[in-house]
């Protein structure tokens, strides 16, 4: 029935109609079967592929995490070894420096002792030379004094004997 442009059906939109429910259910089951045949397989395989992809990504992430932890552990070990090696090198450098310093000090002491010894020897030689010169001068003075005293000139052999005798006398008196 048509009244003023509105179609009124028997019953309302919310009142149950068994025929409509039946055909709606049949249509739904048919669409469901068609979708199951045509779309369910691809949807499931797409979901399985997606699940495999996600699982693969998770596995790769775990593997990358494990590798990163291993690399971090190795880096820490290498850093510890490098620290130990640097400490060893520093310690060896200090020991070498100390040995070098001790060697230089020892060498300097030996050189100083050698220089002192050489200086003492040189002083002793100069002392001997000075004594020899002094003896010769004393001998000459003694000869000149003796010549003046006795007013005679002695020959060279006699003069040498007298000088040697005086030198021996002086040496024995000094020692």
From Swiss-Prot:
Entry's localization field: Cell inner membrane
What the entry lists under SUPFAM superfamilies is as follows: F1F0 ATP synthase subunit B, membrane domain (SSF81573)
Q: Taxonomically, which superkingdom?
A: Bacteria
Q: Which residues cross the membrane?
A: 14-34
Q: Name one Pfam family in it.
A: ATP-synt_B
Its keywords, alphabetically, are: ATP synthesis, Cell inner membrane, Cell membrane, CF(0), Hydrogen ion transport, Ion transport, Membrane, Transmembrane, Transmembrane helix, Transport
A molecular function annotated in GO for this UniProt entry is: proton-transporting ATPase activity, rotational mechanism
Q: What is this entry's stated membrane topology?
A: Single-pass membrane protein
Q: Which GO terms describe its cellular component?
A: plasma membrane; proton-transporting ATP synthase complex
Summarize subunit and interaction data from the UniProt record for this chain: F-type ATPases have 2 components, F(1) - the catalytic core - and F(0) - the membrane proton channel. F(1) has five subunits: alpha(3), beta(3), gamma(1), delta(1), epsilon(1). F(0) has four main subunits: a(1), b(2) and c(10-14). The alpha and beta chains form an alternating ring which encloses part of the gamma chain. F(1) is attached to F(0) by a central stalk formed by the gamma and epsilon chains, while a peripheral stalk is formed by the delta and b chains.
Q: Briefly, what is this protein's role?
A: F(1)F(0) ATP synthase produces ATP from ADP in the presence of a proton or sodium gradient. F-type ATPases consist of two structural domains, F(1) containing the extramembraneous catalytic core and F(0) containing the membrane proton channel, linked together by a central stalk and a peripheral stalk. During catalysis, ATP synthesis in the catalytic domain of F(1) is coupled via a rotary mechanism of the central stalk subunits to proton translocation.
Q: Which HAMAP family match?
A: ATP_synth_b_bprime (MF_01398)
Checking PANTHER family in the record gives: ATP SYNTHASE SUBUNIT B (PTHR33445:SF1), ATP SYNTHASE SUBUNIT B', CHLOROPLASTIC (PTHR33445)
UniProt similarity note: Belongs to the ATPase B chain family.
Q: What is this protein called?
A: ATP synthase subunit b
Protein species of origin: Chlorobium phaeobacteroides (strain DSM 266 / SMG 266 / 2430)
The gene coding this protein: atpF
């Amino acid at each position: 029935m048509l009244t003023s442009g509105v179609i009124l059906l028997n019953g309302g939109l919310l009142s149950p109609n068994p025929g409509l429910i039946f055909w709606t259910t049949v249509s739904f089951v048919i669409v469901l079967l068609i979708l199951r045949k045509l779309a369910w397989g691809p949807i499931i395989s797409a979901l399985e592929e997606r699940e495999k992809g996600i699982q693969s990504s998770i596995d790769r992430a775990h593997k990358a995490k494990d590798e990163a932890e291993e690399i971090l552990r190795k880096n820490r070990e290498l850093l510890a070894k490098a620290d130990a090696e640097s400490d060893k090198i520093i310690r060896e450098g200090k020991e070498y420096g100390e040995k070098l310093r001790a060697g230089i000090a020892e060498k300097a002491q030996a050189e100083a002792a050698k220089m002192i010894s050489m200086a003492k020897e040189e002083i002793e030689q100069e002392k001997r030379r000075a004594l020899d010169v002094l003896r010769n001068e004393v001998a000459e003075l003694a000869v000149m004094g003796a010549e003046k005293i006795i007013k005679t000139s002695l020959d060279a052999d006699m003069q040498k004997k007298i000088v040697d005798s005086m030198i021996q006398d002086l040496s024995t008196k000094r020692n």
